[in-house]
Amino acid sequence: MTIRAGAETFRGRWLVGCDGGRSTVRKAGGFEFVGTDSEFTGYSVEVEMADPDQLSVGRHYTPTGMYTYARPGTIAMVEFDGGAFHRLQPITLEHVQAVFRRVSGADVTLTALKLATTWTDRAYQATAYRKGRVLLAGDAAHIHSPLGGQGLNLGLGDAMNLGWKLASTIRGDAPAGLLDSYWSERHPVGAQVLDWSRAQVAIMRAARSSRALEAIMRDLIDTRDGATYFAERVWGVSLRYDLGGNHPLVGRSAPDFELVDGTRLGELIRNGKGLLLDFDVSAPLEALASRWGGRITYVASDANDRLGLSAVLVRPDGFVAWAGEATPDLEEAARAASRWFGEPDEALLSS
């Protein structure tokens, strides 16, 4: 395919659009982008004001929106039903002053605007992440409000999931359907984040029902289990792909095991290959890994806390493909290896 940008021309066999929420690749590729339009315009500003003592620090809900006053000069505010603010419009002191008075109801005079940015809760997602040799990742595939900071983890997760699968496809050693699993694994995660961002917007409304929902949320977050649940969901660490398998770790991000020599799992998966980590130093597992040649790295070492496992097979993106307890099931391990790294090398099988 050929991409022309001004006087430059780029050619490649594959194209991955990671070019943001207004993605040129997505539009040129004809990807359908569906979702919900914004209900508010958000502003994050640094200002100088004549009478800062009129404002109290903290989050404040009002009939027209909400604002957070963190320290003198720093304001974040959301205006519902105030009309869309076009991103190409200049953000002037007069505009920020008018919005702040509408939202806060406070007769505070802003005297200087140092920094300003706007954002919305527009939530859209591509109905497909791949068309032939063109793929989407990050904000090109999905957009949502920045509340909770979920977009960074979401986009990085796309890149980690896609990168090794595309590399395997280009090398020619990918098993059937590997690249399609990018869509089946990542699209539901994106949809879930969009729904969570919509739920956050519902709670921000001034309606009595929204305040009741917020009170329930606060009660839940005040508990250890509730706080853990919400933190894991927002940070993405509770994610589990449906990869089959009988162990609860399969489909989850692998724990960063520390081996007895101090090496950590994260250091062992930076080469883009699968990793078979054998805590029991088992000859049959070493032989199994060797059947995949250079596609799977075999490491035999105990760990300081192996979580009751005898061995674990980890994909290049850090997710567990297979986990064994006590006497490992070699057939199950081989099936997992074939699913993610292709069939074993016939020459190695016969040797």
Where are these regions (language model features)?
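Helical substrate-recognition/capping region of FAD-dependent monooxygenase/halogenase enzymes
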Residues: 98, 102, 168-351
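Core Rossmann-like FAD-binding/catalytic domain of the broad FAD-dependent monooxygenase superfamily
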Residues: 1-214, 218-221, 347-351
